[in-house]
Swiss-Prot record:
<dbReference type="InterPro" id="IPR036393">
    <property type="entry name" value="AceGlu_kinase-like_sf"/>
</dbReference>
<dbReference type="InterPro" id="IPR002478">
    <property type="entry name" value="PUA"/>
</dbReference>
<feature type="binding site">
    <location>
        <position position="56"/>
    </location>
    <ligand>
        <name>substrate</name>
    </ligand>
</feature>
<dbReference type="GO" id="GO:0003723">
    <property type="term" value="F:RNA binding"/>
</dbReference>
<keyword id="KW-0418">Kinase</keyword>
<feature type="domain" description="PUA">
    <location>
        <begin position="282"/>
        <end position="360"/>
    </location>
</feature>
<dbReference type="Pfam" id="PF00696">
    <property type="entry name" value="AA_kinase"/>
</dbReference>
<dbReference type="InterPro" id="IPR005715">
    <property type="entry name" value="Glu_5kinase/COase_Synthase"/>
</dbReference>
<dbReference type="InterPro" id="IPR001057">
    <property type="entry name" value="Glu/AcGlu_kinase"/>
</dbReference>
<dbReference type="InterPro" id="IPR041739">
    <property type="entry name" value="G5K_ProB"/>
</dbReference>
<protein>
    <recommendedName>
        <fullName>Glutamate 5-kinase</fullName>
        <ecNumber>2.7.2.11</ecNumber>
    </recommendedName>
</protein>
<dbReference type="InterPro" id="IPR011529">
    <property type="entry name" value="Glu_5kinase"/>
</dbReference>
<feature type="binding site">
    <location>
        <begin position="217"/>
        <end position="223"/>
    </location>
    <ligand>
        <name>ATP</name>
    </ligand>
</feature>
<keyword id="KW-0808">Transferase</keyword>
<comment type="pathway">
    <text>Amino-acid biosynthesis; L-proline biosynthesis; L-glutamate 5-semialdehyde from L-glutamate: step 1/2.</text>
</comment>
<feature type="binding site">
    <location>
        <position position="155"/>
    </location>
    <ligand>
        <name>substrate</name>
    </ligand>
</feature>
<keyword id="KW-0547">Nucleotide-binding</keyword>
Length: 374
């Protein structure tokens, strides 16, 4: 299926809009521009598409209302600005959507909400119900309570996690650039826009790790990482300029603009989709070459015999990452043994587990049902 056709057929779309596209150069919200975004989303809804909006802007809005002339540096002041600004942000959205006969819902999330399986399922159920009622959910990070997300977090990652959560067909990330370039366009006049790239392309891995100097500032770096995260659950991602007229409608109709990042694989099963988007790992298992091959080629469970080392502070049931001998990410999964137990089992066949630990638990460190290959 060609790009145009595949994108145009997307029925569940997540749209992420950053602060720079929602504000008047940091001087509060651009109410008129927000009205244009809302009109485009309303048009997608009129076409029968379900839309989830991931929107920044609460801190910028709160800064103006609290009288800050520049972005505060104190975390408590950022939290206060987020709390005040979120009220205005949601109010502006609600008033604009109401003009189009659409109902909205505010949802504030943290990474913890999506890394805990029970809370993840509750959030997914709520969002599915809202979409079933024709509501447009407006999602933001709960900056008032999550200090590290204010300092270092980004809504690109949140957009990818939400795409994972609602099993979206398409994630649209709007930015101040035309898309992803083969070189940093700020430094190289001959930089060429990458119109299409596969999530398995080695160039993306280099970009996502901060290498090659292609992306310049961290803004585009987070978008590449978000696209790779969305790709794990089978969602397509389009990175496009939010300055283009009617960009959301044009992109969703399949118009060739921006950069299309295509997932390597189709949608994964629901549990593995959660595992793929689970961010907070408690440790790492270092695998030998044989174990890496078995996981990638044969889809087996991870056995202790193929593990060279264990790092971190994980307990039974925690998320860990599996890496090869060079440190490359291979898989994520829920481990059956604590780090102390795992260290005792390194390189041992499953038949020795009972004798080593004094009890016989599961024969594998990570069962294949609790493992997702990256």
């Amino acid at each position: 299926m060609e790009m145009r056709e595949k994108i145009a057929k997307a029925q569940r779309v997540v749209v992420k809009i950053g602060s720079a596209l929602l504000t008047n150069d940091g001087q509060g919200l651009d109410v008129a521009r927000i009205g244009l975004w809302v009109a485009q989303i309303a048009e997608l809804r009129a076409q029968g598409k379900e839309v989830v909006l991931v929107s920044s802007g609460s801190i910028a809005a709160g800064m103006k209302r609290l009288g800050f002339s520049s972005r505060p540096t104190q975390v408590n002041e950022l939290q206060a600005a987020a709390a005040v600004g979120q009220m205005e942000l949601v109010g502006v959205y609600e008033s604009h959507f109401e003009k189009h006969g659409l109902c909205t819902a505010q949802i504030l999330l943290t990474h913890d909400d999506l890394s805990n399986r029970r809370r993840y399922l509750n959030a997914r159920s709520s969002l599915r119900t809202l979409l079933g009622f024709g509501v447009v959910p407006i999602i933001n990070e709960n900056d008032t309570v999550v200090t590290d997300e204010i300092r270092f977090g980004d809504n690109d990652t949140l957009g990818a996690l939400v795409a994972n959560l609602v099993e979206a067909d398409l994630l649209i990330i709007l930015t101040d650039q035309q898309g992803l370039f083969d070189k940093n366009p700020r430094d190289h006049q001959d930089a060429t826009l990458i119109s299409h790239i596969s999530a398995s392309d080695n160039r993306l891995e280099s970009m996502a790790s901060g290498g090659a100097g292609v992306l310049g500032s961290g803004g585009m770096l987070t978008k590449v990482r978000a696209a790779l995260l969305a790709a794990r659950s089978g969602a397509d991602t389009l990175i496009a300029s939010g300055r283009e007229e009617n960009v959301i409608v044009r992109v969703a109709s399949g118009e060739m603009m921006g950069t299309w990042l295509q997932p390597e694989h189709g949608r994964v099963a629901a549990r593995k989709q959660w595992l793929a988007g689970h961010l907070k790992s408690r440790g790492a298992l270092i695998l030998d070459d044989g174990a890496v091959k078995a996981l990638r080629k044969e889809g087996t469970s991870l056995l202790a015999v193929g593990v060279k080392d264990a790092q971190g502070t994980f307990s039974r049931g925690d998320m860990v990452v599996c890496v090869d001998l060079q440190g490359g990410l291979v898989a994520r999964g829920l481990v059956n043994y604590s780090v102390a137990e795992t260290l005792k089992l390194l390189g041992q066949p499953s038949s020795n587990i009972g004798a080593i630990l004094g009890y016989k638990g599961e024969p594998e460190l990570i069962h294949r049902d609790d493992l997702v290959i990256i």
